[in-house]
UniProtKB/Swiss-Prot annotation:
GO terms for biological process: respiratory chain complex IV assembly. Transmembrane segments: none annotated. Residues 166-187 are annotated as: Disordered. Gene3D superfamilies: Tetratricopeptide repeat domain. Disruption phenotype: Knockdown in the nervous system results in reduced lifespan, mobility deficit and shortened synaptic branches of motor neurons. This is Cytochrome c oxidase assembly factor 7 homolog. The lineage of its organism: Eukaryota, Metazoa, Ecdysozoa, Arthropoda, Hexapoda.
Length: 266
């Protein structure tokens, strides 16, 4: 049957049919992709977050479907789908880690961020080396945001002191200095050393993966000669690219976060 998606009645019928197809694919044919799409349907179309949460959880637990593990991690962190819940960061981390082990780049990104950022909940222990592993894996899986965060970490370094912020996803390149009156920091004071060459490499990859902030950083690195030989032509090239991306973002409209199980962005 052909649908005229300009007609409200046809749209409603089409959407209802989608739900039937996803339920059949999930519960009768036992297809994990269909189960995940059912979760997206319940979330995006029906706005039934409680049922969506249950579907994502079971699809992760029963089938090891990576994107569902990531989605349930998000639900757990936010307390979404559970009335009155404030969220459970520890459960969220468990599902992010499971999703990362199943090679979902977003799950690796969130696993890493929970471990390296001091702004995260107390339930999660600060563990920069392990967090760095997760972020590196995410970047290796071509997650632009992870590559950008890794670049920021190497721009400023990560100090051992517990009261220092771990992740510095800088909007501009450069290095930080100790407060006036304090002795300069030594290499032994850092968990992750400042390394502008590595910062450049991660920024370059993030920019190639269309992270506009990384492209802006790359422009500044070329302009200053940070981590790479100074090159005004390249600096202008990446500045122009970052501005083009900024314009693209402004033109984008909110879209339904649907079919995330088959590679759609969140």
């Amino acid at each position: 049957m052909a649908y005229d998606l300009k007609k409200e009645s046809d749209v409603k019928e089409y959407v209802e049919k989608l739900g039937v197809e996803y339920r059949f694919g999930c519960y009768s044919e036992k297809k994990p992709e269909a189960c995940h799409l059912l979760g997206d349907y319940l979330e995006g179309i029906k706005k039934d977050f409680e049922k969506a949460s249950k579907v994502y959880k079971s699809t992760c637990d029963d089938y090891g479907y990576a994107k569902s593990c990531y989605k349930y991690g998000n639900y757990s962190f936010l307390g979404k789908g559970k009335s009155g819940s404030k969220g459970n960061p520890q459960v969220a981390y468990e599902y992010y880690e499971k999703g990362c082990n199943l090679n979902d780049s977003d799950a690796c990104l969130h696993s890493g961020l929970l471990l390296v950022s001091k702004s995260m909940p107390r339930e999660i222990d600060w563990n920069v080396p392990k967090g760095l592993e997760f972020l590196t894996k995410s970047c290796d899986l071509n997650n632009a945001t992870a590559c950008f965060y890794l670049s920021g970490m190497h721009i400023s370094g990560v100090q051992k002191k517990a009261d220092q912020s771990a992740v510095t996803a800088s909007s501009g390149s450069g290095t930080s200095s100790p407060p006036a009156g304090q002795p300069p920091l030594k290499d032994s004071d850092y968990i992750v050393l400042k390394d502008m060459k590595k910062a450049f490499q991660f920024a370059h990859k993030a920019c190639e993966l269309r992270n506009m902030y990384a492209c802006a950083n790359l422009s500044q690195m070329y302009a200053r000669g940070d981590g790479i030989e100074k090159n005004e032509k390249e600096a202008e090239k990446y500045k122009k690219l970052a501005l083009e991306m900024q314009d693209e973002v402004k033109k984008q409209h909110d879209t339904l976060g649907f079919q995330q199980g088959v590679g759609m962005p969140n």
